[in-house]
A protein has these predicted regions:
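Short alpha-helical "patches" and their helix-cap loops
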Residues: 70-76, 148-155, 256-260
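Aromatic-acidic/polar surface patches that form glycan- and anion
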Residues: 50, 127-131, 231
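Glycine-rich loops and low-complexity Gly/Arg-rich segments
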Residues: 53-54, 63-66, 93-98, 129-133, ...
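C-terminal catalytic region of ATP-dependent kinase domains
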Residues: 156-272
Length: 272
Protein backbone atom coordinates (compact mmCIF):
# COMPACT_ATOMS: atom_id res chain seq x y z
CA UNK A 1 0.00 0.00 0.00
CA UNK A 2 1.26 3.46 -0.86
CA UNK A 3 -1.28 5.61 0.96
CA UNK A 4 -1.45 9.34 1.23
CA UNK A 5 -0.70 10.53 4.73
CA UNK A 6 -3.54 10.48 7.22
CA UNK A 7 -3.18 13.70 9.15
CA UNK A 8 -5.22 14.71 12.16
CA UNK A 9 -5.78 18.35 11.33
CA UNK A 10 -7.59 20.57 13.82
CA UNK A 11 -7.75 24.07 12.43
CA UNK A 12 -9.50 27.30 13.37
CA UNK A 13 -11.80 29.02 10.88
CA UNK A 14 -10.90 32.69 10.52
CA UNK A 15 -12.90 34.24 7.66
CA UNK A 16 -16.13 33.71 5.74
CA UNK A 17 -15.97 33.46 1.93
CA UNK A 18 -19.27 32.27 0.45
CA UNK A 19 -22.07 29.71 0.49
CA UNK A 20 -21.76 26.50 -1.52
CA UNK A 21 -24.31 24.44 -3.41
CA UNK A 22 -25.62 21.11 -2.10
CA UNK A 23 -28.01 19.54 0.34
CA UNK A 24 -25.70 19.93 3.34
CA UNK A 25 -25.64 23.72 2.76
CA UNK A 26 -21.89 23.97 3.19
CA UNK A 27 -19.99 27.25 3.32
CA UNK A 28 -16.46 28.10 2.27
CA UNK A 29 -14.27 29.43 5.07
CA UNK A 30 -10.62 30.35 5.39
CA UNK A 31 -8.68 28.61 8.17
CA UNK A 32 -5.63 29.65 10.13
CA UNK A 33 -3.36 27.63 7.82
CA UNK A 34 -4.18 30.05 4.99
CA UNK A 35 -6.23 27.55 2.98
CA UNK A 36 -9.91 27.68 2.09
CA UNK A 37 -12.18 24.80 3.13
CA UNK A 38 -15.67 23.70 2.14
CA UNK A 39 -17.23 23.29 5.58
CA UNK A 40 -20.18 21.19 6.75
CA UNK A 41 -21.67 22.15 10.10
CA UNK A 42 -23.10 20.09 12.95
CA UNK A 43 -26.61 21.47 12.38
CA UNK A 44 -26.64 20.78 8.65
CA UNK A 45 -30.05 19.63 7.35
CA UNK A 46 -28.85 16.12 6.45
CA UNK A 47 -27.50 14.67 9.70
CA UNK A 48 -24.81 15.25 12.29
CA UNK A 49 -23.40 11.87 11.30
CA UNK A 50 -22.66 13.23 7.83
CA UNK A 51 -19.62 14.96 9.34
CA UNK A 52 -18.27 11.65 10.63
CA UNK A 53 -19.05 10.03 7.28
CA UNK A 54 -17.03 12.68 5.47
CA UNK A 55 -14.05 12.21 7.76
CA UNK A 56 -14.15 8.42 7.48
CA UNK A 57 -14.75 8.30 3.73
CA UNK A 58 -12.14 10.91 2.83
CA UNK A 59 -9.50 9.49 5.16
CA UNK A 60 -10.03 5.89 4.07
CA UNK A 61 -10.02 6.89 0.40
CA UNK A 62 -6.80 8.86 0.77
CA UNK A 63 -5.22 5.89 2.57
CA UNK A 64 -6.06 3.82 -0.52
CA UNK A 65 -4.17 6.34 -2.67
CA UNK A 66 -7.20 7.96 -4.32
CA UNK A 67 -7.20 11.63 -5.30
CA UNK A 68 -9.36 13.18 -2.58
CA UNK A 69 -9.00 16.70 -1.15
CA UNK A 70 -7.40 16.82 2.28
CA UNK A 71 -9.98 16.59 5.08
CA UNK A 72 -9.78 18.64 8.24
CA UNK A 73 -11.60 19.14 11.51
CA UNK A 74 -12.19 22.86 11.98
CA UNK A 75 -13.13 24.80 15.05
CA UNK A 76 -15.59 27.52 14.04
CA UNK A 77 -15.59 30.30 16.67
CA UNK A 78 -18.90 31.77 17.81
CA UNK A 79 -17.52 35.22 16.99
CA UNK A 80 -17.14 34.24 13.32
CA UNK A 81 -20.72 32.94 13.16
CA UNK A 82 -22.09 36.09 14.79
CA UNK A 83 -20.09 38.42 12.55
CA UNK A 84 -21.00 36.64 9.28
CA UNK A 85 -24.66 37.33 8.37
CA UNK A 86 -24.52 34.90 5.43
CA UNK A 87 -23.28 32.00 7.55
CA UNK A 88 -26.73 30.43 7.82
CA UNK A 89 -28.70 27.36 6.76
CA UNK A 90 -32.30 27.06 5.62
CA UNK A 91 -34.45 24.46 7.37
CA UNK A 92 -38.05 24.31 6.15
CA UNK A 93 -39.09 27.96 6.26
CA UNK A 94 -36.63 28.94 8.97
CA UNK A 95 -33.21 30.54 8.67
CA UNK A 96 -30.73 29.36 11.31
CA UNK A 97 -27.20 30.43 12.07
CA UNK A 98 -24.65 27.72 11.39
CA UNK A 99 -23.49 26.11 14.60
CA UNK A 100 -20.15 27.06 16.08
CA UNK A 101 -17.74 24.47 17.40
CA UNK A 102 -16.25 21.52 15.52
CA UNK A 103 -17.11 21.17 11.83
CA UNK A 104 -15.84 19.10 8.91
CA UNK A 105 -13.78 20.77 6.21
CA UNK A 106 -12.60 19.62 2.79
CA UNK A 107 -9.70 21.68 1.46
CA UNK A 108 -10.81 23.73 -1.53
CA UNK A 109 -8.81 23.15 -4.69
CA UNK A 110 -7.76 26.61 -5.77
CA UNK A 111 -4.94 25.96 -8.22
CA UNK A 112 -5.93 26.51 -11.85
CA UNK A 113 -9.37 26.09 -13.38
CA UNK A 114 -11.80 23.93 -11.40
CA UNK A 115 -14.92 22.46 -13.05
CA UNK A 116 -17.69 20.20 -11.79
CA UNK A 117 -18.52 18.98 -15.30
CA UNK A 118 -16.65 17.78 -18.37
CA UNK A 119 -18.23 16.51 -21.61
CA UNK A 120 -17.86 12.82 -22.43
CA UNK A 121 -15.32 13.66 -25.13
CA UNK A 122 -13.00 15.09 -22.46
CA UNK A 123 -13.65 12.59 -19.67
CA UNK A 124 -11.72 9.76 -21.28
CA UNK A 125 -8.68 12.06 -21.40
CA UNK A 126 -8.73 12.88 -17.69
CA UNK A 127 -5.26 12.22 -16.30
CA UNK A 128 -6.37 9.79 -13.59
CA UNK A 129 -9.50 8.37 -15.23
CA UNK A 130 -8.55 4.87 -13.97
CA UNK A 131 -9.24 6.08 -10.43
CA UNK A 132 -12.96 6.08 -11.20
CA UNK A 133 -12.85 2.28 -10.89
CA UNK A 134 -10.94 2.62 -7.62
CA UNK A 135 -13.43 5.04 -6.08
CA UNK A 136 -16.23 2.82 -7.39
CA UNK A 137 -14.82 -0.04 -5.30
CA UNK A 138 -14.54 2.31 -2.31
CA UNK A 139 -18.15 3.44 -2.73
CA UNK A 140 -19.33 -0.20 -2.79
CA UNK A 141 -17.32 -0.95 0.34
CA UNK A 142 -18.69 2.05 2.27
CA UNK A 143 -22.19 1.82 0.75
CA UNK A 144 -22.23 5.34 -0.65
CA UNK A 145 -25.93 5.96 -1.26
CA UNK A 146 -25.35 9.03 -3.42
CA UNK A 147 -24.12 9.33 -6.98
CA UNK A 148 -20.37 9.78 -7.30
CA UNK A 149 -19.39 13.46 -7.04
CA UNK A 150 -16.24 14.78 -8.73
CA UNK A 151 -14.51 18.05 -9.51
CA UNK A 152 -11.95 18.42 -12.27
CA UNK A 153 -8.85 20.56 -11.90
CA UNK A 154 -6.25 21.59 -14.42
CA UNK A 155 -3.39 19.13 -14.24
CA UNK A 156 0.04 20.37 -13.19
CA UNK A 157 1.74 17.51 -15.04
CA UNK A 158 0.29 17.93 -18.52
CA UNK A 159 -2.41 19.76 -20.40
CA UNK A 160 -5.81 18.49 -19.33
CA UNK A 161 -7.64 17.78 -16.09
CA UNK A 162 -7.33 15.60 -13.01
CA UNK A 163 -10.36 14.21 -11.14
CA UNK A 164 -10.71 14.92 -7.42
CA UNK A 165 -13.35 12.83 -5.65
CA UNK A 166 -15.53 14.69 -3.16
CA UNK A 167 -18.61 14.30 -0.98
CA UNK A 168 -18.71 11.15 1.13
CA UNK A 169 -21.55 12.32 3.36
CA UNK A 170 -23.97 9.64 2.20
CA UNK A 171 -21.66 6.72 2.92
CA UNK A 172 -23.29 4.25 5.31
CA UNK A 173 -26.67 5.61 4.11
CA UNK A 174 -26.09 9.11 5.53
CA UNK A 175 -27.43 9.34 9.08
CA UNK A 176 -28.90 5.83 9.15
CA UNK A 177 -25.60 3.98 9.44
CA UNK A 178 -26.80 0.88 7.68
CA UNK A 179 -25.87 -0.72 4.37
CA UNK A 180 -28.79 -0.97 1.90
CA UNK A 181 -26.68 -2.26 -0.98
CA UNK A 182 -28.24 -1.72 -4.41
CA UNK A 183 -26.80 -1.40 -7.90
CA UNK A 184 -28.30 2.07 -8.31
CA UNK A 185 -25.89 3.95 -6.07
CA UNK A 186 -22.32 5.18 -6.14
CA UNK A 187 -22.06 5.24 -9.95
CA UNK A 188 -20.74 8.28 -11.78
CA UNK A 189 -23.41 9.65 -14.12
CA UNK A 190 -21.17 9.61 -17.22
CA UNK A 191 -20.32 5.97 -17.85
CA UNK A 192 -17.59 6.78 -20.36
CA UNK A 193 -15.19 6.87 -17.39
CA UNK A 194 -15.68 3.10 -17.07
CA UNK A 195 -15.17 2.27 -20.75
CA UNK A 196 -11.73 0.74 -20.17
CA UNK A 197 -12.85 -1.52 -17.32
CA UNK A 198 -12.24 -4.94 -18.85
CA UNK A 199 -11.97 -7.15 -15.78
CA UNK A 200 -10.96 -7.34 -12.14
CA UNK A 201 -7.48 -6.06 -12.90
CA UNK A 202 -9.05 -2.71 -13.79
CA UNK A 203 -9.88 -2.20 -10.10
CA UNK A 204 -6.28 -2.61 -9.02
CA UNK A 205 -4.40 -1.63 -6.97
CA UNK A 206 -7.33 -0.23 -4.98
CA UNK A 207 -9.38 -3.44 -4.67
CA UNK A 208 -6.47 -5.38 -3.18
CA UNK A 209 -5.75 -2.47 -0.85
CA UNK A 210 -9.35 -2.59 0.37
CA UNK A 211 -9.23 -6.34 0.93
CA UNK A 212 -6.03 -6.01 2.97
CA UNK A 213 -6.89 -2.71 4.67
CA UNK A 214 -5.50 -2.84 8.22
CA UNK A 215 -8.05 -2.75 11.01
CA UNK A 216 -5.54 -0.70 12.99
CA UNK A 217 -5.72 2.01 10.32
CA UNK A 218 -9.52 2.00 10.48
CA UNK A 219 -9.37 2.42 14.25
CA UNK A 220 -6.84 5.25 13.90
CA UNK A 221 -9.06 7.11 11.43
CA UNK A 222 -12.17 6.57 13.56
CA UNK A 223 -10.28 7.66 16.66
CA UNK A 224 -9.99 11.16 15.21
CA UNK A 225 -13.77 11.59 14.89
CA UNK A 226 -14.79 14.12 17.57
CA UNK A 227 -17.06 12.69 20.29
CA UNK A 228 -19.36 15.67 19.68
CA UNK A 229 -20.30 14.07 16.35
CA UNK A 230 -21.10 10.51 17.48
CA UNK A 231 -21.11 8.28 20.55
CA UNK A 232 -17.99 6.13 20.83
CA UNK A 233 -19.82 2.81 21.11
CA UNK A 234 -21.90 3.53 18.02
CA UNK A 235 -18.82 4.55 16.05
CA UNK A 236 -16.93 1.43 17.06
CA UNK A 237 -19.84 -0.75 15.93
CA UNK A 238 -19.70 0.99 12.55
CA UNK A 239 -15.96 0.37 12.26
CA UNK A 240 -16.49 -3.34 12.91
CA UNK A 241 -19.10 -3.48 10.14
CA UNK A 242 -16.84 -1.59 7.73
CA UNK A 243 -14.04 -4.06 8.43
CA UNK A 244 -16.34 -7.04 7.94
CA UNK A 245 -17.39 -5.75 4.49
CA UNK A 246 -13.86 -5.79 3.05
CA UNK A 247 -14.23 -9.40 1.95
CA UNK A 248 -17.52 -8.64 0.15
CA UNK A 249 -16.40 -5.86 -2.17
CA UNK A 250 -15.88 -8.15 -5.19
CA UNK A 251 -19.35 -9.58 -4.62
CA UNK A 252 -20.82 -6.07 -4.45
CA UNK A 253 -19.07 -5.01 -7.66
CA UNK A 254 -20.22 -8.19 -9.42
CA UNK A 255 -23.82 -7.45 -8.41
CA UNK A 256 -23.63 -4.09 -10.18
CA UNK A 257 -22.22 -5.73 -13.29
CA UNK A 258 -25.12 -8.20 -13.35
CA UNK A 259 -27.73 -5.46 -12.96
CA UNK A 260 -29.58 -3.42 -15.58
CA UNK A 261 -27.45 -0.43 -14.54
CA UNK A 262 -24.20 -2.19 -15.50
CA UNK A 263 -21.73 0.56 -16.45
CA UNK A 264 -19.00 -1.87 -17.53
CA UNK A 265 -19.91 -2.54 -21.15
CA UNK A 266 -16.45 -3.78 -22.15
CA UNK A 267 -15.95 -6.17 -19.20
CA UNK A 268 -15.50 -9.67 -20.63
CA UNK A 269 -13.68 -11.46 -17.80
CA UNK A 270 -15.93 -13.84 -15.86
CA UNK A 271 -14.09 -15.08 -12.79
CA UNK A 272 -13.36 -12.96 -9.68
Amino acid sequence: MNPQNIVTSLLVATDYIRAMRGGAQSHMLTANDGHAYVVKFANNPQSLRVLANEWLGCSIGRALGLTIPEPAILYVPATLVESSPSLVIQVSKSTLKCSYGLAFGSRFISEGQVLDYLPDSALSQVENVREFSGVFALDRWLCNCDGRQVVFCESERRRGFRAHFIDFGFCFNAGEWNFPDTALRGIYAHKVVYQNVGGWQSFEPWLSRIESFPLTTLWAIAGDVPPEWVERDTLFQLVERIDARRSRVRELIAAVRQSQRNPFGTWTEDKP
